Amino acid sequence: MERKMNSFKSMSPKEKIIYLLTLVYLLPFFILVAANMLFSMFQTTYMELYLDTEKPLYKSDHPLLLLVLVLLLITGLTYCFKKKEITTEICSAFEKFSLIWAVFISLFIIFLFRVRVACDSAYLSDIAIDFLNGDYSSLTGNGYLVHYPHQLGMIALLEVTYAVFGIENYTVLQFLNVIAIVSTVYYLHRISDEMFHKPQIQILLSLLCIGLIPLYLYTTFIYGDIPSLGLIVPAVYYIVRYLNTQKRIYSIPAIVLMTLSIQLKSNSSIILIAAIIILFLHMICHKDKFVVLFLLLLIGTPYITNTAVNTYYAHAAGLEHIPSGIPKVAWIAMGLQSNDYIENGWYNSYNWDVYTENNFDASATTDACIDSIKQSVQEFAGHPKTCLKFFYRKFISQWNDPGYQAQITIEWYSRHRDDQSDLALYFIYGNGRFILEAMMNFYHFTILLGSSIFAFC
């Protein structure tokens, strides 16, 4: 602690500001990750089968077994690193194996389960087919896109894919997911190269990529998540590359990839915000004037692209403009509502219902949502124990599922086929399901423990 204080005193004013800003996010990050690590040690969240909605359930974990396994893993890795000199060739071999493994296991999952689409994926697929047939009714009345116009980017991808490869060609879309997953694994290695320059870390990363079972299970998931991930990770790499080299050429792929990722999944805007903060701090520290243009394009290009997509579909549908959609505040209000059947703060269709009840008026919907938020806050303020229980259940139900709902997604999608193989059924409903759960649970706990130690140190 004394050494850290002396180091802080020796910093320049700019360095002190950046250090303090780092603590602003690092301390909450440590608290959340450490709490989740403790929860994960004693309890595991999993999803109930055979239902039409997510239903998180909980079971006790085996803390001593988890700790012993982690200790054995650390001991084994330490022994190997000391016994064998880690060369560039060894790192390259591990990376190549992780990439080959990503391709192999992803394709294996595709051809094992041979699933179709369901839930929101089915809505998007049907809308893309309607668009190809000149039917844009989902953009009018109480249509799906009146509520969720942010899905137009993914629908555009589906429309193009169906036009080129045939209607409902889910295999091609799943192959695109494989490409996105390989892109993610490859560029994670490149980011590690840029940030750490340590062969041991490269090998650890390769091993972690091999263990990404939830990601590989999502290969069959036809939605914006996986394609956008395959774009946003390389976008981050090119931003890091620019920060390290200040070569302006890297800003171009960063902007293009970030824009495409946001079009497919609006949640990628979170990464955009993080990139803006980092580039802004870089500009202050290094007096890099080009960052101003970089930031303008990084912010403006997704907006312009989104406007272009909306304008195209508005013209095709004969509308003056695309509906504004459900205000974001509706998700906040829904996330603060109790739910005895599913779980606190989970999706309960409130956002859809409140928007419909207010005749698709964004302003009136916002007012109703703010009232709902105030009501929830007042309830929490008046009943602290209820508040604590609410957020505890919300937290563990969402962040203590080591499978990230990948297994329940496979189960939902598999219902649309009657010819599943015995091996597929073994992993969906049989003991194979529990084997996957155990592997993902150990992986999940290991990641949380390592992240907690890193944030603390």
Report residues per predicted region.
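Start-transfer (signal-anchor) and selected internal transmembrane alpha helices
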Residues: M1-F108, V291-I299
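Membrane-interface anchor segments at the N-terminal boundary of transmembrane helices
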Residues: I18, T53-V68, V172, K394-C457
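Extracytoplasmic catalytic/substrate-binding loops of multi-pass membrane glycan-assembly enzymes
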Residues: F113-I129, N133-E168, A368-C369, L388
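Loop-to-helix entry region of an early transmembrane alpha helix in multi-pass inner-membrane enzymes
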Residues: Y148, L152, A156, V164-S183, ...
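Transmembrane-helix motifs of polytopic, lipid-linked glycan transferases
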Residues: F175-F196, P234, L449-F454
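Transmembrane-helix signature of polytopic, membrane-embedded enzymes
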Residues: L188-G211
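Short acidic/glycine- and proline-prone juxtamembrane loop motifs at membrane-interface regions
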Residues: P214-S228
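Membrane-proximal stem/loop segments at transmembrane-domain junctions that anchor or position
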Residues: Y313-D418
